[in-house]
């Protein structure tokens, strides 16, 4: 915020006017496109100038549960799509970007800050932050993205009729299709290891889906529940000799520490299949899933309707991404002692080889 220096003696009128102009100009700041770490600090940055047709500057609070490539891609996709449609950062939109650093208490504090600031919209990236936002306010429109099952998370009444002040986009995975990739890589695979955060609804849903899908495919799931990212490597090591492959779902805690899983997998030559493409780019062998950048863009399209007064969250069905794509990592396969089938390479939308 600007601080005003009160004049204690008479100055020429022209000098006084010029001083005010300089103070105003110096007070304008740009909002960073990277979220602030941990608990919220300060206020949203002031726009650098420019207004929409109605002369309004919008305040949008953005909070993600933790920083990792998939969630970051959703955030950047949202901001870019908003700008393409006339809602530009530092012109007519102020973004307050925050990261809860994996802590629900931080997520609640951040949501309370957004409420106190009178934000026009909250973008909650991942299930815990969406739950924190809804717990905090029933008035400010909330859009979520990267939420696997918003009904199970008690965010919406139904996918078709959310009700209340919350809606958004889901990143529900085609879990069965992803597990089929394991069989394609290793036809004799019978046991699949899954590490997940026991405190995240999103993760529990995916583990249950994996169990059901594995049963259909003649495999079993060996699960290891964790409560901290520091436990990921130990959990992976505990499965060595017991599993034929690892499956890493879109669990925010595990994905943020996927390097720990990959270290064990590479040393023990255990293939890793992931729930999203950024994990493949980090070193998993393959995934069949969504593009988080495009999911963010899709969420922005919903935000545009809300901010323009064309729709309300209660009446906007939760949306999902229609197109899935196969992404494979040849280098990762080599490190884990796996030869990628030519059929898989031929149908892949993207092949990473460096």
Segments from the language model and where they lie:
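Structural motif
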Residues: 94-116, 224-239
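Bacterial signal peptide processing site
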Residues: 27-30
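C-terminal motif of bacterial Sec signal peptides marking the signal peptidase cleavage site
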Residues: 21-25
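Hinge/cleft segment of the Venus flytrap/periplasmic-binding protein
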Residues: 308-354
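Beta-alpha junction/loop-to-helix N-cap segments that form part of ligand/metal-binding clefts
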Residues: 100-157, 248-266, 270, 275
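An alpha-beta-alpha
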Residues: 60, 78, 167-215, 318-332
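Hydrophobic alpha-helical segments within soluble ligand-binding/sensing domains
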Residues: 150-189, 291-311
């Amino acid at each position: 915020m600007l601080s005003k220096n009160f004049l204690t003696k008479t100055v020429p009128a022209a000098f006084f006017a010029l001083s005010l102009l300089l103070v105003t100009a110096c007070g304008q700041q740009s909002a960073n496109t990277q979220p602030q770490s941990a608990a919220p600090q300060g206020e949203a940055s002031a726009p650098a100038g420019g207004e929409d047709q109605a002369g309004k500057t919008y305040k949008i609070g953005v909070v993600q549960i933790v920083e990792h490539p998939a969630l970051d891609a959703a955030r950047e996709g949202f901001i870019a799509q908003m700008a393409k449609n006339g809602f530009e950062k530092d012109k007519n939109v102020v973004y307050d970007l925050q990261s809860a650093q994996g802590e629900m208490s931080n997520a609640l504090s951040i949501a309370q800050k957004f409420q106190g600031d009178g934000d026009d919209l909250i973008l909650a990236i991942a299930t815990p932050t969406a739950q924190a936002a809804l717990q905090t306010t029933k008035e400010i429109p909330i859009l979520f993205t990267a939420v696997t099952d918003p009904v199970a998370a008690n965010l919406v009444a139904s996918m078709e009729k959310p009700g209340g002040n919350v809606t958004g986009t889901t990143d529900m995975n085609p879990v069965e299709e992803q597990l089929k990739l394991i069989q394609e890589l290793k036809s004799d695979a019978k046991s699949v290891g899954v590490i997940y955060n026991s405190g995240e609804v999103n993760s529990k849903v995916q583990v249950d889906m994996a169990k059901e899908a594995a049963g259909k495919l003649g495999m079993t799931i060996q699960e290891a529940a964790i409560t901290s990212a520091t436990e990921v490597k130990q959990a992976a090591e505990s499965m060595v000799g017991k599993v034929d492959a690892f499956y890493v779902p879109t669990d925010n805690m595990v994905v943020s520490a996927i390097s720990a899983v990959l270290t064990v997998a590479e040393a023990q030559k255990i293939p890793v299949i992931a729930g999203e493409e950024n994990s493949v780019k980090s070193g998993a062998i393959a995934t069949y899933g969504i593009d988080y950048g495009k999911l963010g863009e899709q969420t922005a399209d919903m935000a545009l309707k809300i901010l323009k007064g064309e729709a309300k969250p209660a009446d906007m069905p939760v949306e999902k991404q229609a197109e899935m794509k196969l992404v494979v990592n040849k280098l990762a396969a080599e490190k884990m002692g796996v030869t990628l089938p030519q059929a898989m390479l031929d149908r892949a939308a993207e092949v990473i080889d460096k």
